[in-house]
Amino acid sequence: MKRTYQPNKKRRVKKHGFLNRMSTSDGREVIRRRRQKGRHSLTVSDQ
């Protein structure tokens, strides 16, 4: 049986990257909450 997590850099950034987050109001809300919490990295593309 194949495992559920099959790492792929392109897919990771396309789905969870900064531009994708900023493209929706809910995504911007995620960024806002993470900034407020003081997260070192806001999205997966901040490495």
From Swiss-Prot:
Gene name, Swiss-Prot/TrEMBL: rpmH
Biological process per Gene Ontology, one example term: translation
Compositionally biased tracts (Basic residues): 31-40
Gene Ontology molecular-function annotations: structural constituent of ribosome
Short name of any one Pfam family annotated for the protein: Ribosomal_L34
Family designation: Belongs to the bacterial ribosomal protein bL34 family.
Source organism, top-level taxon: Bacteria
Keywords: Ribonucleoprotein, Ribosomal protein
Organism the protein comes from: Malacoplasma penetrans (strain HF-2)
Annotated spans, Disordered: 20-47
InterPro entries in the cross-refs: Ribosomal_bL34, Ribosomal_bL34_CS
Protein name: Large ribosomal subunit protein bL34
Gene Ontology cellular component annotations, sorted alphabetically: ribonucleoprotein complex; ribosome
